[in-house]
UniProtKB/Swiss-Prot annotation:
Interacts with EIF4EBP1, EIF4EBP2 and EIF4EBP3. Does not interact with eIF4G (EIF4G1, EIF4G2 or EIF4G3). Component of the 4EHP-GYF2 complex, at least composed of EIF4E2, GIGYF2 and ZNF598. Interacts with GIGYF2 (via the 4EHP-binding motif); the interaction is direct. Interacts with EIF4ENIF1/4E-T (via YXXXXLphi motif); increasing affinity for the 7-methylguanosine-containing mRNA cap. This is Eukaryotic translation initiation factor 4E type 2. Residues 1-38 have a biased composition (Basic and acidic residues). It comes from Homo sapiens (Human). There is a cross-link at K134, K222 (Glycyl lysine isopeptide (Lys-Gly) (interchain with G-Cter in ISG15)). GO terms for cellular component: cytoplasm; cytosol; eukaryotic translation initiation factor 4F complex; P-body. The modification Phosphoserine is found at S13. The keyword Flavoprotein does not apply. MRNA binds at Y78, E79, H110, W124, E125, R174, F175, Q176, E177, D178, I179, K222, M223, P224. Ubiquitinated by ARIH1. The consequences of ubiquitination are however unclear: according to a report, EIF4E2 ubiquitination leads to promote EIF4E2 cap-binding and protein translation arrest. According to another report ubiquitination leads to its subsequent degradation. Recognizes and binds the 7-methylguanosine-containing mRNA cap during an early step in the initiation. Acts as a repressor of translation initiation. In contrast to EIF4E, it is unable to bind eIF4G (EIF4G1, EIF4G2 or EIF4G3), suggesting that it acts by competing with EIF4E and block assembly of eIF4F at the cap. In P-bodies, component of a complex that promotes miRNA-mediated translational repression. Involved in virus-induced host response by mediating miRNA MIR34A-induced translational silencing which controls IFNB1 production by a negative feedback mechanism. One of its GO terms (molecular function) is RNA cap binding. Changing W63A: Unable to bind capped mRNA.
């Protein structure tokens, strides 16, 4: 499975901060907690390709989330529920993570895998996402693992050819269907969203009559879980055609 996508260049980053203690015990405890977080962040080494590894154009981070169906979720509780798995900067580092992860088809309940560029959280409200949107495809059960792998390999290999527009991808496992989506920065750029749609059709080998949804994150924030004005109704769950003699 090596060399399934072309490596380009790496992009690493780090952050740091400093804090001071206050005189009161209560404020001191708060500052200590914040200081510990910042010290941990500053000590975290930037993720870079190893010797002889094939660097990616961007660093990416895997995330995982799971929640109880039917329970209302605020943006704060949603953020707390997202768990970061790890960040990688090369083809080899990706496979080290991916080869040990459960495949989407084997997940149970209301679970999601997210793969986003480093520094972008898989949330509508993130600065990189707030003016963007996502293409959505609903799948019959049993197809998520293959489609997810094809999607993220295409994303890591820069097959969408839209510059920095791609933010990340999500696979959502539900009880009666699975959903994959790819997020971009600028929902108003129709040429870019159309190119993403066409590339998505190609890398997933979708039938020509497959109906896809595009939903802006602004619409998602206003009406979570509902059909919005810029969302196209997806009437038939896609399944591959079988060539039967």
């Amino acid at each position: 499975m090596n060399n399934k996508f072309d490596a380009l260049k790496d992009d690493d980053s780090g952050d740091h901060d400093q804090n001071e203690e206050n005189s009161t015990q209560k404020d001191g405890e708060k500052e200590k907690t914040e200081r510990d977080k910042n010290q941990s962040s500053s000590k975290r080494k930037a993720v870079v390709p190893g010797p002889a590894e094939h660097p990616l154009q961007y660093n990416y981070t895997f995330w995982y989330s799971r929640r109880t169906p039917g329970r209302p979720t605020s943006s704060q509780s949603y953020e707390q529920n997202i768990k970061q798995i790890g960040t990688f900067a090369s083809v080899e580092q990706f496979w080290r993570f991916y080869s040990h992860m459960v495949r989407p088809g084997d997940l149970t309940g209301h679970s999601d895998f997210h793969l986003f560029k480093e520094g972008i959280k898989p949330m509508w409200e993130d600065d990189a996402n707030k003016n963007g949107g996502k293409w959505i495809i609903r799948l019959r059960k049993g197809l998520a693992s293959r489609c997810w792998e094809n999607l993220i390999l295409a994303m890591l290999g820069e097959q969408f050819m839209v510059g920095e527009e791609i933010c990340g991808a999500v696979v959502s496992v539900r009880f009666q269907e699975d959903i994959i989506s790819i997020w971009n920065k600028t929902a108003s750029d129709q040429a870019t969203t159309a190119r993403i749609r066409d590339t998505l059709r190609r890398v997933l080998n979708l039938p020509p009559n497959t109906i896809m949804e595009y939903k802006t994150h602004t619409d998602s924030i206003k009406m979570p879980g509902r059909l919005g004005p810029q969302r196209l109704l997806f009437q038939n769950l896609w399944k591959p055609r079988l060539n039967v003699p």
